[in-house]
Amino acid sequence: MKDLLKFLKAQTKTEEFDAIKIALASPDMIRSWSFGEVKKPETINYRTFKPERDGLFCARIFGPVKDYECLCGKYKRLKHRGVICEKCGVEVTQTKVRRERMGHIELACPTAHIWFLKSLPSRIGLLLDMPLRDIERVLYFESYVVIEGGMTNLERNQILTEEQYLDALEEFGDEFDAKMGAEAIQALLRNMDLEQECEQLREELNETNSETKRKKLTKRIKLLEAFVQSGNKPEWMILTVLPVLPPDLRPLVPLDGGRFATSDLNDLYRRVINRNNRLKRLLDLAAPDIIVRNEKRMLQEAVDALLDNGRRGRAITGSNKRPLKSLADMIKGKQGRFRQNLLGKRVDYSGRSVITVGPYLRLHQCGLPKKMALELFKPFIYGKLELRGLATTIKAAKKMVEREEAVVWDILDEVIREHPVLLNRAPTLHRLGIQAFEPVLIEGKAIQLHPLVCAAYNADFDGDQMAVHVPLTLEAQLEARALMMSTNNILSPANGEPIIVPSQDVVLGLYYMTRDSVNAKGEGMVLTGPKEAERIYRAGLASLHARVKVRITEYEKDDNGEFVAKTSLKDTTVGRAILWMIVPKGLPFSIVNQALGKKAISKMLNTCYRILGLKPTVIFADQTMYTGFAYAARSGASVGIDDMVIPEKKYEIISEAEAEVAEIQEQFQSGLVTAGERYNKVIDIWAAANDRVSKAMMDNLQTETVINRDGQEEQQVSFNSIYMMADSGARGSAAQIRQLAGMRGLMAKPDGSIIETPITANFREGLNVLQYFISTHGARKGLADTALKTANSGYLTRRLVDVAQDLVVTEDDCGTLEGITMTPVIEGGDVKEPLRDRVLGRVTAEDVLKPGTADILVPRNTLLHEHWCDLLEANSVDSVKVRSVVSCDTDFGVCAHCYGRDLARGHLINKGEAIGVIAAQSIGEPGTQLTMRTFHIGGAASRAAAESSIQVKNKGSIKLSNAKSVVNSSGKLVITSRNTELKLIDEFGRTKESYKVPYGAVMAKGDGEQVAGGETVANWDPHTMPVITEVSGFIRFTDMIDGQTITRQTDELTGLSSLVVLDSAERTAGGKDLRPALKIVDAQGNDVLIPGTDMPAQYFLPGKAIVQLEDGVQISSGDTLARIPQESGGTKDITGGLPRVADLFEARRPKEPAILAEISGIISFGKETKGKRRLVITPVDGSEPYEEMIPKWRQLNVFEGERVERGDVVSDGPEAPHDILRLRGVHAVTRYIVNEVQDVYRLQGVKINDKHIEVIVRQMLRKATIESAGSSDFLEGEQVEYSRVKIANRELEANGKVGATFSRDLLGITKASLATESFISAASFQETTRVLTEAAVAGKRDELRGLKENVIVGRLIPAGTGYAYHQDRMRRRAAGELPAAPQVSVEEASANLAELLNAGLGGSDND
């Protein structure tokens, strides 16, 4: 019996390991794995079906074909276990050893491993410092390579052609050694002295200055060091022994009809063995060189094909012209080992069916068809039946269940009670795509789903299917109940708002119920309470919408958390009073005393969750749903054609628009406007007409005229069904109603340009043939878009998950003082996102002070929940520094304080939460709602882009930041700085609006002045950029020579003449080096200095500048000296939607990025070249100036002599994130990426918390480049994991040594995934071959820190419930408690078991 227990223990024993290492296998190692050499290409005997001896399926090498039976049948049964049959040489053991025993092939000549040869950069090439072409020519027997030059003038590694080799032979005889083929390369690799080579290269590195050479040397040093440290020998990259896969992993299966289905590997192995044997024979016969050579080349090709078919030359194909699947193909790609079998497995105990509505279910229930339940819970039912003694054996139980006896159903009821099941709907885009429910048995064959969880699943009932999974073990059931139950997932992890929100019918019902109506039946009653309201409604004495007074009792929490009752008479309606009955204690009545739309209901549930917690919210949500359904039914809302009321004004508006269009057409024909202008104007006219029609239509639908109690007419909100559906947010929108009852409007062609004849009809009137045809473009494009979008969005999610999968909360507080400063998001005159939404659920990084005082309002390290946010708002705090994931100091993972609130739970996040995956899902899940479009700016949009003034919307005071200005002659301020921002501050000191003010803008109001709403505060000319003088004096032209550097132009319309500076390309030879400038002198002709500097005021003029002043004119500060025409941006496309998000996360450089100042200093221009100007920035402190060549066509934002700060924009354009990181630091680039991504999502109305984007940014900033190594082991210019540098520097500094200096790198998500420390994770993502090659050469260890690696090796993941398990393992490992594995091999134990069983089954005589 003891043996039996030992056996069961041995069965469950897992290999205890902490890391996985990959390395090159030496020939001896391969031989040690092998159980024998495969000598023949034969597989099995076609008559006896027995494996051939020494063949690819040989039983002697790989083990017996039948359990405990040798091949010839001499030894059978268990008692001969371990015997090796002397006749056939087969060991008597279990047949499963054929899955693990390997063989080998001794190659007759060495062969290069194609991965190390062809996987770029070629490892062999890098190690020998030879081009890949040369190595290939040697390997495939086209050239010789010199192995030892001896005393001759031939160098090592030199390539010789056939002729050169023969000449050298004649000349030097056998003083030198040159060979061809893999043996030559092997010899070269064997002769390398790695350590000495390393020393030599390091010396070279210190001496060289050329950038390219340094890069190349660093690469080689890294590779050489990897070889030295890992203990790999270079010559192992050349195979002399080839391992053979165990036969059961490349099976040969007989089909009916005497044919065989075989794995492609067998074909490839056969090829290798055939060629190898032929080569051996040729060598024995001492065949001519050329024949042997050809055979060797063929062997090399066969081995290449086996390892990675198609990597070099044409892929070898099988009988059906299909390329054979090699070993490399087995592991890579979607169908490879990693993604098909290790990361995605099939699930036992699951079923799927169509879903249908379960409106009577509670939130934690789902309806499960009896048939399904019986099948899924079979094992539990069998167990219960046996336990009760109703069935003696499992077989009997099975029969009972098949007969579906009555008792079985009773037992099924018991088994199912409180046993949660998981429901999953594909595609599972975020974690709410799998939730747990308690099953309720139902008749029929469809699964019933609770309507409120549809939003999380994105499910509807038009034929969607869902899968049911049964958690079997107790732990699984516990996790399902505690973590995955639908009632525990009320808030969305993406934004912390309720996701269990009523929609459609329910919203309509609640909206209808809470609307009020003028002069409804029963208006003006005074009722004793909600109960009475319900009674009089049921009795038909009052309408649901009647305005009445009701006595309402509200409960408020006092400071001790006790409920205090407060009764008062409220003006409300009958419906709202009835709804109040289901609202839980503790919420104010005002929450239902309004017409409830979708937003209001969501807010109501949110408030309920925050004040009362989970349980009341769940009950409340269910109650709202039942009530909503009931009253939606009573409302009788329907859609009829007469509900789509077409406004009378429509035809008038359209005829006006047609007249305008005709007028423009006339202007065009008489040549007053260009074709482009005409097109844009026409589009504008129709867009405006469309807006007017839809406004008229909405006004018409929105209100109806009724007679009130006094007999007067009164306007009230309409009860039109279509309008109610749109207004409540149940279904439809103003835009859709516009198409039904207004006009369809402008349509786009397939290429995205707008057709200038709009569809003036709507769907109620019906479309004519042409209009219908035009409409088809959009419809078809919509379908094509959706299909593309799904794939793209899925791929984005996959990359995001891959880059962030190993980010887990690993400690409570890292203690950092860093953080990011949060301000409200303000675009122009609107607050897009208030501060409260941005800081809610974050932890403060420093004390927040009361504005204008030194009092602490919120102490450091406080989690800002709703109450704190109210406090911040009450004190009108404008910016808060909060902790952020990006600045978290934890080495592996992040700390809870830097992350803040767990959005889906509402408290500080727990340790072990997989925030990386949550972030990836939150960003990826709404991906399918984003557009795929590139927006063309045309028509209305392009003219709105050229703004020329700032008009404020609210009243308040003006605040200018980083502004330099001068006062002009009329006493107005003129801005002379580049990135000036104008903010409007309200009386509480909060920022309400924010605008960019360009250079040269004239301010109507100064800093700190009060303005009223609607006032214009700044003006400028959008088409030219002025040059503004900061001093007063007289103009003096320098180098302004007519015909050489300038030319005079006269305007035909005004007759004014002006000077235009010639571009250097247009100048004569004499004018090339002249630099036209305007100098300002005083009355005596002395230079005037720019205030605050010792520089004379002179303004250099770039090409095309227009000067409207004459030499010697008097000017005063703030005047415009010259104007530089701005080419308007034209119609640039803005990339929007998904492609934009992908670009941001991939950190792609934009096409023509903005040029930023690399250092702070004074601008000047050096000598120009043909197409470029030389920009020089001279630092004020007198250090080295910085020079940059800028193409002429780039428009510069700076003038000579102007001062710029590091990171300022020198030339406009989209900013490249890498530049922002380099010049302005980590926080700036985080802010840039977060804001840009949020802009895209905000446009679609999707809310995502900033945290999630920051998490991804942290992963993009994972690497750092070493700038100087200090006392560390890093190489200069090497890219290393940021955490590794941090740890190394910490250790060095602790020992008083100099740490390494480094700069952070920004990698795109794909590159960041591939550059992860874990090679298992990287290999399962993309470019499997390259990743594994690199890892093997470097002898990498995978510490199994991330989630993916642990899934692949089949362990619990180090997150969630697995986090505790891993922590415990590490603790016990450290304490040395983990026991050594039991010393019983599985075979032995299983044999013992079998013996015991035999003994028990009458096998022994002495009982």
From Swiss-Prot:
Report the top EC class in one word. Answer: transferase
Question: Gene Ontology terms, cellular component aspect?
Answer: DNA-directed RNA polymerase complex
Q: Which cofactor does it need?
A: Mg(2+); Zn(2+)
Q: What is its EC number?
A: 2.7.7.6
- Sample GO molecular function, one term: DNA-directed RNA polymerase activity
Where does the chain bind Zn(2+) 1? 70, 72, 85, 88
Q: Name one GO biological process term.
A: DNA-templated transcription
Domain of life assignment:
Bacteria
Question: Which positions are tagged coiled coil?
Answer: none
Cofactor: bound how, per the entry note?
Answer: Binds 1 Mg(2+) ion per subunit.
Record: residues binding Mg(2+): 460, 462, 464
The cross-references to CDD domains, in alphabetical order and at most eight, read: RNAP_beta'_C, RNAP_beta'_N
For this protein, the record's Gene3D superfamilies field holds: 1.10.132.30, 1.10.150.390, 1.10.1790.20, 1.10.40.90, 2.40.40.20, 2.40.50.100, RNA polymerase II, clamp domain, RNA polymerase Rpb1, domain 3
Q: Where does Zn(2+) 2 bind?
A: 814, 888, 895, 898
Keywords recorded for this protein, A-Z: DNA-directed RNA polymerase, Magnesium, Metal-binding, Nucleotidyltransferase, Transcription, Transferase, Zinc
Q: Which reaction does it catalyse?
A: RNA(n) + a ribonucleoside 5'-triphosphate = RNA(n+1) + diphosphate
Record's HAMAP family?
Answer: RNApol_bact_RpoC
The entry's function note states: DNA-dependent RNA polymerase catalyzes the transcription of DNA into RNA using the four ribonucleoside triphosphates as substrates.
The record describes its quaternary structure and partners as: The RNAP catalytic core consists of 2 alpha, 1 beta, 1 beta' and 1 omega subunit. When a sigma factor is associated with the core the holoenzyme is formed, which can initiate transcription.
Q: Which family does it belong to?
A: Belongs to the RNA polymerase beta' chain family.
- List the protein's name: DNA-directed RNA polymerase subunit beta'
Q: What organism is recorded for this protein? A: Klebsiella pneumoniae subsp. pneumoniae (strain ATCC 700721 / MGH 78578)
Quote the gene name from the UniProt entry. rpoC
